[in-house]
Amino acid sequence: MENERAKQVYLAKLNEQAERYDEMVEAMKKVAALDVELTIEERNLLSVGYKNVIGARRASWRILSSIEQKEESKGNEQNAKRIKDYRTKVEEELSKICYDILAVIDKHLVPFATSGESTVFYYKMKGDYFRYLAEFKSGADREEAADLSLKAYEAATSSASTELSTTHPIRLGLALNFSVFYYEILNSPERACHLAKRAFDEAIAELDSLNEDSYKDSTLIMQLLRDNLTLWTSDLEEGGEQSKGHNQQDEN
């Protein structure tokens, strides 16, 4: 088992360097299927692989949606229909990737997580991938994805508040993504600002005790929290018109 594990981790690293993220994900899924607690390195390889696989499709979907709206506003119905068909294909790919990693998390990762850090990491991932589903789903499907995302983020936050320091990069990354969820998915800039500001302020208060190893990661996420706060606060001051241009940043 250890030989197989080492082999798949090596292949994942190789595919990351070659920017072959689909193969990177497949290698790390084989490691996860061994039903053992992943090391920090393995956990990060799995996360990076999926982030890149999903990130490319999310970017495609946003571009297609924007072009589709422009074609509709010009009255070019035939072009809009072509784009919609293509966007639907991208949505099918997005759904497949999201449900794939969510199944891996529930079946192979959460049951074998023994540390608070791992538990927070995996529930944050669940929140993220249900959020990605909510980005393009509609009606009852969107409502369900949003509800499951909220529950996962809440579980991660509950665990993080007792298990991780306020400056821990995973706790900060969770606050960053959870606040984006409130802003983009639940259309609640007030709650988004409150969550982001609280996380930022709590981390600032403990900055002197920041672990040297994670200093760069933590301060980068704090900067993203502050950038989002600046954007969202200006939106609120301008009468609540939300920035739907996806200028706000999450960890991806």
Curated annotation (Swiss-Prot):
PROSITE patterns from the UniProt entry: 1433_1 (PS00796), 1433_2 (PS00797)
Recorded GO MF terms: ATPase binding
Signal peptide: none
Listed SMART domains: 14_3_3
Record's keyword terms, sorted: Cytoplasm, Nucleus, Phosphoprotein
Cell compartment(s), UniProt: Nucleus; Cytoplasm
Role, per record: Is associated with a DNA binding complex that binds to the G box, a well-characterized cis-acting DNA regulatory element found in plant genes.
Protein name: 14-3-3-like protein GF14 omicron
Protein source organism: Arabidopsis thaliana (Mouse-ear cress)
Primary gene name: GRF11
